[in-house]
């Protein structure tokens, strides 16, 4: 994502059960928008012509994220864009806790065939206004987050630590960690499991 550019930024906060707009702006990427991105988002070069470059928004973006949890549907992907833009703008990248609603949906909704934002919002009956636009996706993700958190609580994950444990359980990192605890001489093919 370091070579790619943001064309729109939106942040909302979930406060007291309400979704509160924090920041929203089109962003001038300083170069032509690839046609596939325009096709997906509807954002054109003409739309961003008078928009601020990310560098002008960077202090506001950083401020919007401080003392908050960065939540996104595929958080690692979105964070790679945000952190790259902040770095490019010379703005310090805040160390923020992150929560990925895709990972949370995998644990809370294991029966769904897919965990895309479209599938998860459909499951919860959440309507997305402006799909593939930053503000529409941010609001939809906030709505999904509220429902996922309620469902996670029924699974015993009510605290930040429990949510982190739930979303990382069984991931590649956890599997690698478990494997690293095994003796080097361990042969999984010779292991007899109890009947």
Segments the model singles out, each with a brief description of its role:
Residues 137:
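Conserved catalytic/binding loops enriched for acidic/polar residues
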Residues 104, 120, 140, 144-147:
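Generic recognition of well-ordered alpha-helical segments
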Residues 1-98, 110-132:
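Conserved non-catalytic scaffold segment of RNase H-like nuclease domains
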Residues 103-111:
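An acidic intrinsically disordered interaction segment
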Residues 142-195:
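Acidic two-metal-ion nuclease catalytic site recognized across multiple nuclease folds
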């Amino acid at each position: 994502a370091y070579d790619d550019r943001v064309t729109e930024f939106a942040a909302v906060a979930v406060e007291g059960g309400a979704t509160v707009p924090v920041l929203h702006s089109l962003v001038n990427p300083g170069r032509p928008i690839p046609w596939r991105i325009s096709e997906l988002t509807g954002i054109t070069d003409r739309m961003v012509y008078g928009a601020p470059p990310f560098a002008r928004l960077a202090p506001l973006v950083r401020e919007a994220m401080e003392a908050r949890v960065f939540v996104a549907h595929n958080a690692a992907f979105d964070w790679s864009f945000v952190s790259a833009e902040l770095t490019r703008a010379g703005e310090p990248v805040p160390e923020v806790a992150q929560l990925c609603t895709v990972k949370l949906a995998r644990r809370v909704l294991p029966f769904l065939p897919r965990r895309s934002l479209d599938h998860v919002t459909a499951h919860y009956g959440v309507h997305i206004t402006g799909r593939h636009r930053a503000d529409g996706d941010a609001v939809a993700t906030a709505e999904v987050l509220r429902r996922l958190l309620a469902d996670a609580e029924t699974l015993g994950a009510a605290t930040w630590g429990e949510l982190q444990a739930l979303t990382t359980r069984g991931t590649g990192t956890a599997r690698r960690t478990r494997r690293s605890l095994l003796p080097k001489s361990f042969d999984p093919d010779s292991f007899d499991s109890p009947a």
